[in-house]
Amino acid sequence: MGNVATRKRPGCHHHIGRNEENLDDDEDGPAKKRLRIGEPQAENEYQKLAFKSRLQKLKKCRPHLKRRTYKVEEADPRPPVPRFIVDDYGDYEKPEPTRKEFAIPWFEHLFLPEFPTRSVINEKSFVLERQLGRGSFGVVYCASAIHDSERKFAIKMQEKREIISKRAVLQVKREASIQRLLPSHPFIARTYSTWQTRTHLYSLLQYPTGSTGDLFSVWRQRGSLSEAAIRLIGAELASAIDFLHQNDVIYRDVKLENVVLDQWGHALLIDFGLAKKLKQGSSTGTICGTLQYMSPDVASGGTYSHYVDWWSLGVLLHILLTGIYPYPNSEATHHANLKFIDYSTPIGCSREFANLMDRMLAVSITHRLCSFTVLHAHPFFRSIDFSKLEQKDYTPAAEIGNAEYDTYHKSEDALDDALFKENYDVSCGRNVIFAVLPVFW
């Protein structure tokens, strides 16, 4: 038959028989593991071996080195926006952060443009001296400028976390907007600048040097005031309230704690947290304010307008003379529990003051004093010339002034006026104290 060439099946030359491989292993001695992998996979294996080798050497050189483990959370493609701010996500609920001590480092856009992120004036320009008060969202400090320690200001620091958690973003922005757009008035505390950082909102406010504190502290320390002191305080606050009403602002929180006395005893209205833009002739129905100063119109849940501020002013004047509330509401904890019966008529006062209280605190709106024009013409304020009142030509009673300032000087007001005019652009009606410069957080 001859030599017949055996044909190989296609692909047989690519195979290495298992038996043949075992024979090679037996010939070499112990079985050896041979890597039959591609080049990329082999390179990856070599990198792992090299990493293990370096790690072992590092452990030998540094025996005190401890292995730290980190919990890697799955990335969420959606932005970390609270449910009550953006409702487009349906049933999406962001879990609570594990480290609550860290404040929220975002949401700058929520507070723009009332609180810009870049400002010439920032928290590093002042030295905090003492705490003046604490509010729902932060603290108010008395501060002095670094370049001039004698100039005093009030700096309000509000936490973004508290504002967002209590859903008060619009309220805080409304307060800052009203104060920034409001023109200057001698009996309203001015707002010089506002800005924000990653965690806080800041407001630079007027605070008179040598102030005796708020009206509540003065009344608590010195007791009931004389009618002469009450007359001037009432006239100055009435002028401030009428100025707000003329600028379509309803205040809604007139009380002793929101009035600060300067070193000479003149009144300054502060804290616009509950103020609201409201045009003349319009009405609103939000139930807000301090319970003991709340008018029947607000407590009943109906609609009301600017005239509720005059009721609150009447309660304030009544407390300054008698030391008690005009109605038995000192223990009330809800607006539904307020009682407007058993009116406490002031005793030991002049007939004019008693008549003023009767008219300002009348439950019926038809018999109540509800305008500045009527109050201006009341006999109790006959000795006050309201045209000269804003020039502070009247000297307050010595019982409410600061003994260290026995004479009145207008240099302080001149500095404040210059600063305010520099920071207020009448043409556009906006506070332009801040320029576009970086603030390093």
From Swiss-Prot:
Catalytic site positions: D253 (proton acceptor)
Keywords: ATP-binding, Kinase, Nucleotide-binding, Serine/threonine-protein kinase, Transferase
Signal sequence, start to end: none
Reactions listed under catalytic activity: L-seryl-[protein] + ATP = O-phospho-L-seryl-[protein] + ADP + H(+); L-threonyl-[protein] + ATP = O-phospho-L-threonyl-[protein] + ADP + H(+)
Transmembrane segments: none
EC identifiers of the protein: 2.7.11.1
InterPro entries: Kinase-like_dom_sf, Prot_kinase_dom, Protein_kinase_ATP_BS, Ser/Thr_kinase_AS, STKc_AGC
One term of GO molecular function: protein serine/threonine kinase activity
Pfam family, one: Pkinase
Residues that bind ATP: L132, G133, R134, G135, S136, F137, G138, V139, V140, K156
Domain Protein kinase residue range list: 126-381
Region: Disordered, residue numbers: 1-41
Enzyme class: transferase
Comp. bias intervals (Basic residues): 1-16
Top-level taxon of origin: Eukaryota
Entry's family note: Belongs to the protein kinase superfamily. Ser/Thr protein kinase family.
Official protein name in the record: Putative serine/threonine-protein kinase F31E3.2
Record lineage: Eukaryota, Metazoa, Ecdysozoa, Nematoda, Chromadorea
